[in-house]
Amino acid sequence: MRFKELIFPLRVEEEELVEKFYEEGFFNFAIEEDEKGKRVLKIYLREGEPLPDFLKDWEIVDEKITTPKDWIVELEPFEIVEGIFIDPTEKINRRDAIVIKLSPGVAFGTGLHPTTRMSVFFLKKYLKEGNTVLDVGCGTGILAIAAKKLGASQVVAVDVDEQAVEVAEENVRKNDVDVLVKWSDLLSDVEGTFDIVVSNILAEIHVKLLEDVNRVTHRDSMLILSGIVDKKEDMVKRKASEHGWNVLERKQEREWVTLVMKRS
């Protein structure tokens, strides 16, 4: 499958507008730095797919035809947190570390973003052998795969984007782990309870998630909520408090915040 890659300049004040892409159901984008260190927005469209209306007023600075394979080649193996490596190239062969093999496809989440890194950090810190884990908004499946390789007994990964589900399923097969990947609009198709719920999505979506998360957790469960812009942190905390959750630990990189929560 071939894609058209469109590159747009991105000012700091425009980054919050990118959050609206999720609300429009558009997931095939990434925020990166160009060779001059300037932030740019990369959009990926299937050949023949029209530019979404909400992007028609944005200035395009570059355009090319590409494939998912091209993006994988650009990524080199890296250590996302101590002892856990992301390997898009299958170059790493180590027995003294956790290695996550990755075929990014076009779903968000290669492990380069601070929100993914902080989520993996807290999974490594808090996940106990035999825990059950639910990954809501799984994207490429990095967090679900990490959870299984860290010792979780059962891992379920869900996403509302069908393409993300396909990419996550491919990555699960590539890593030869037992993870159930399925479509679900947040928790709509999720059954059972879990020791840890991890979710790397937008603050507004966390607010919706918190309205139903008690159904899939128990008194000793833990939430790891990432993808929160710092100025929206209080909004998430207020909603969490309404449903009986308090912040156990907080981590921030740049403007991005990750919260670990326990029942009060």
From Swiss-Prot:
Keywords: Cytoplasm, Methyltransferase, S-adenosyl-L-methionine, Transferase
Organism, as annotated: Thermotoga sp. (strain RQ2)
Binding site for S-adenosyl-L-methionine: T116, G137, D159, N200
Keyword Cytoplasm assigned: yes
Entry EC no(s): 2.1.1.-
Catalytically driven reaction(s): L-lysyl-[protein] + 3 S-adenosyl-L-methionine = N(6),N(6),N(6)-trimethyl-L-lysyl-[protein] + 3 S-adenosyl-L-homocysteine + 3 H(+)
Key word DNA damage present: no
Family: Belongs to the methyltransferase superfamily. PrmA family.
A GO term, aspect molecular function: protein-lysine N-methyltransferase activity
Pfam families: PrmA
Protein name as it appears in the record: Ribosomal protein L11 methyltransferase
A biological process from GO: methylation
CDD domains: AdoMet_MTases
Subcellular location: Cytoplasm
PANTHER family: ELECTRON TRANSFER FLAVOPROTEIN BETA SUBUNIT LYSINE METHYLTRANSFERASE
Record's function text: Methylates ribosomal protein L11.
